[in-house]
Regions:
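Conserved short "hinge" loops at termini or chain/domain junctions
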Residues: 1-76, 90-191
């Protein structure tokens, strides 16, 4: 079975500053990764599978206005930003049978690794902001328009919808910075 894309490469090119001469075979794997790794956890298994089946039967979703609104107003901006984060390494580096090489051009200058990281971080943050809008929209409309959002499934491979796009680190211990090392303090409740 062929993979069904929520957005097309042409949509991505139209929505961004990516040059129109970029080969779509470079863009499609990034869209696929974003769809599987970002959009599926946002929507949950049931809603994602239902959306994909609707796209297969009606590619422009004209018969399903709630899904059309979800895709056009919420998922497309989210996917565009996350593809912006996924695409630069794919376009900068090429895997060959002997090595990983950095692509270059005769009349342009490549960016350095720190600039590449900055571009990826900015696009990821913008994608998280857009993803947060998707989640809030789905939560606000889960009782009326998207009941599958609340019931993602019961099988072992079910992906439950995310409740937020942002995550923070976890403090795993009591440590205090001393000089160049760390000193582990005992927990305060032990005497």
């Amino acid at each position: 079975m062929a993979f069904t894309y929520i957005i097309k490469a042409d949509t991505y090119i139209r929505e961004t500053t990516v040059n129109a001469n970029v080969d779509t075979t470079l863009i499609l794997p990034a869209i696929k990764r974003v769809q599987r790794n970002i959009i599926l956890p946002i929507l949950g298994t049931a809603l994602y599978n239902d959306l994909i089946s609707e796209i297969v039967s009606d590619p422009d979703l004209s018969s399903n206005v709630p899904y059309q609104t979800l895709v056009n107003n919420y998922l497309t901006p989210t996917m565009v930003e996350f593809v912006n984060a996924e695409l630069p390494p794919d376009m900068t580096f090429k895997f060959t049978n002997k090595n990983i090489v950095k692509k270059n051009s005769e009349n342009s200058t490549s960016i350095d690794l720190q600039e590449l990281r900055n571009i990826i971080q900015r696009a990821t943050y913008r994608g998280q902001l857009e993803g947060e809008k998707v989640i809030k929209y789905l939560i606000a409309n889960c009782n009326t328009l998207f009941p599958l959002y609340r019931t993602p499934g019961t099988t072992i491979d079910t992906v439950f919808p995310r409740q937020t796009m942002f995550s923070t680190g976890m403090n795993l211990g009591y440590e205090r910075r001393i000089g160049f090392g760390y000193q582990i303090d005992p927990p305060y409740w032990k005497f």
